[in-house]
């Protein structure tokens, strides 16, 4: 049954909804239930007409708190998606309690991002936003960041509301959007969970993001920047900024090429500061050597009492290193904590032992002006279709 305890779900059913008749046949419970709090449409593909009807129905759900619009446009053309998204978000904008929005795995690109930007800049209730794998790129990504910065001003009005969760991964945000994102984080400084993995951000962009943006978010509990390229410059910046986030529960920087020296700097920062709540530490594939893991083991012993998961696979020390054994003994004594399987450890080459993977601070696109990406004012027209009146349509089908 689709509706259950104020939840309506079509999640993962693989429906291809084209006509009004097809849509209305599967949303009867959604229409009839007055107190819907959560709607899950993910894993289906919706036409423009389907989204128009759904948008009008969603508009009536005044208790709505959570919507999942992930993966709802598979097989839809680039011309369809902007109009379909506009209908959905237009309806959602009337739901004054809707604080959690999932929009991942939809090919918005630059064109379909326009109705998204318009929605994000003015949906005051927004607290949790999930926006991963949307093909934004640096230009549209910067516009999304500026929309959230604009939203912060609206949310500051009494009574204040704050964005708490931002997940924006696999969107090719790159260095060119980092100043916009930094401004966003300065404005949205009550964030507790930030995940931006796999965005092609290089070391200069990482430095901008950490130094001038995320440093303002003193309440951070989760920071995930996995699979971006830190190298030594980014690792130095992370180590320097780490004390700004005393409430961290999860720090995820696997696949970031921290480098041997960078790994030691990060481990030392963990040792020098008490992260009493840190439970998850992801450090895979970062070139961390036996000296780095030795410092890390000391940190776990003295300043990281709550660690439950430590990921170290793919680094350049032996799985039987005495520091690894020390960490395992600490976890055993505490009766909590686990190290991942160290089954893909790297060997330290002669080149690695004599050279650090780093770059001068004026390299890596630092000569580019990252300020020249401006947010465009969005005025996205709704394509009106003659003869379509949703209220009349619903009355005719005896569903209202």
Language model features with spans:
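Leucine-rich tandem repeat or coiled-coil scaffolds
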Residues: 1-400
